[in-house]
Every structure is written in C-alpha cells, then in structure tokens.
C-alpha cells in the first residue's frame, strides 16, 4: 500500500479559518431552517421555556453525532487498538473509501431531518431545534471538508486514521 495523500485539516485550512467558516455555516443553516419552519408554520408563537433542556439536548446531539460516525465503521469491523504509553487510542485501519464517506456524512443526514421534524412537532420550541440544527451543522463542517477531499481519491482507496489526520492509501 502506498500513501496517496495525507489529510490534515489544521495544516490545510488552519484552525481560525475552520472555526470562522463553521460559525458562518451555523448561522446560514439556522436561518434557512428557521425560515423553512416559518414558511410551513406561519404565525407560531415561540416560547423561551426549557432553556436547560435545550443545553442538555445539545450535549446529547453531539454525543449521538459521534456514535453515528462509528456505526458504519463498526459494521465493517475495522477497529484496531494501539497503546501509546498509558493512554489507549483507537485508530481505524484500512477503511474502504465508501464506508468512510458514509461515516462522515451520515450524522448530518440523520440528525438534521430529525431536528427539523422535532421543530414541526413542537412548534412553540422550534427555535431551539433550529439552533441545535445550526450548531450541529457547524460541528459537521470538518466532516464535510474531509469528505470533499476523500471524493477526489481513487475508488479503491483505503483510509487510515492517524493521530493528526487521515492517510489515503492505494494499492500498488
């Protein structure tokens, strides 16, 4: 196996650019989802109760995001544990390109529609669900950037996760 490309988002884009783009993407998604909600349910009065529940739901959504990332990879059973001194760090070895793409995009495609449906189901608290959806979309931005880089890789490529990024491997 040869390394076709190494992807490290911090080196490629920089932390400030990623954060700034993520914040802009959060705002864009919040505005678009809230406008879509207002078009579907005009004149709904919004309630500012349950702010603590909003915070708790946000934490749960970010945890569910991580779990959804891992599910496609676990289905392929490609997990290898490496020990680094006292800490154990899980790394993924030889993940097929399509599995990795599904793993990167699936949290956004699964969680965002659920949040929008929750906004429609609970219209008085729709702004909370739209905010969580926007925050989650910003949290997904690095996944989208990785997916864009992976799309350009050869079809038969494999992905190795390293401590500082991803390696795209191709067979000789």
From Swiss-Prot:
Main location: membrane
Positions of disulphide bridges: none
Regions that span the bilayer: 18-38, 54-74, 102-122, 128-148
Annotated compartments: Cell membrane
One Gene Ontology cellular component annotation held by this UniProt entry: plasma membrane
Pfam families: DUF3267
UniProt entry keywords in alphabetical sequence: Cell membrane, Membrane, Transmembrane, Transmembrane helix
Membrane topology: Multi-pass membrane protein
Name of protein: Uncharacterized membrane protein YhaJ
Gene source species: Bacillus subtilis (strain 168)
